[in-house]
Amino acid sequence: GNTASGLETLWQICASLQRLGYPVVVLDGTAQESDDSPGLLHLLQHATWNDGASLNLGATASSLAVIPAAKGLQHLSRKASGSTRSPMESLLPCFRTYGLMVIHAPASTLGPLLTHTATVPLVVMGSGAAGVMTSYKSLKQIALHTGLPCMVAALLHSNTAAERRKAQSQLMTLQACAERHLGGPIRTTTIATQNPQDLQRLALQLLENAGTMNGALAALTPSNLTGMPAHFVRSH
């Protein structure tokens, strides 16, 4: 389904970024931390842990480090209200050894985390009317907290002319809704999931838009992952 293919695309993008020489750590906001599976919350509670050394991230130079982060991200999201600084800055000491951080989390959690940033979040749209609606909800959540302009990408699985036309039509519908109800324009693009060049182009766009943890941030919001955005940020 859309969720599986969207997740696969997310991992492919992360793999492209690693091939470009950026060690990637993924904070999975859909996975709960526990004593058996420690994650972000444990890092935030134990500041003496050095660069995440006490976490078994299971990563090598060629694999992704993925850690549970649902509770930790919710904690940071709550702390964001009323702050004049990006809540992402507090993560820097934990992940200095990584070149790039990916945050995969619900839009309601991610929105507050993007406050005080200068970025262009990228929303990956699923197919059909449901994909348009889910993408719009993600855009609305981000706009509610940040007012940031977004780019929306439609995934093309077979990359036929008919599929491309349908995707373009859905993007135009979403664009019109965003301009009418959210008060701002969005940029759009299409990504053929079976085309390595398209995936690398998207990875490079994310890298280009990503700033530092105390500067500009970039986000990928795959709304077809049942509304689970993923946020990309350089750690240094």
Where are the regions that the model predicts?
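Inter-motif core of Ras-like GTPase G domains
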Residues: 88-98, 106-129
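Conserved C-terminal guanine-recognition region of P-loop GTPase G domains, centered on the G4
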Residues: 44-54, 132-149
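Short acidic, S/G/P-rich loop/turn micro-motifs used as interaction or catalytic elements
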Residues: 2-5, 32-33, 72-76, 107-111, ...
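Conserved beta-strand segments of the P-loop GTPase G domain that flank and frequently precede/overlap
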Residues: 1, 26-29, 65-70, 101-106, ...
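P-loop/Walker-type NTP enzyme "switch/lid" segment
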Residues: 1-5, 19-99, 172, 196-200
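Histidine-anchored nucleotide/phosphate-binding helix
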Residues: 8-19, 134-144
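Short glycine-/polar-rich loops that comprise or flank the Walker A/P-loop
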Residues: 22, 116-120, 145-150
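C-terminal lobe/tail of nucleotide-utilizing enzymes
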Residues: 148-236
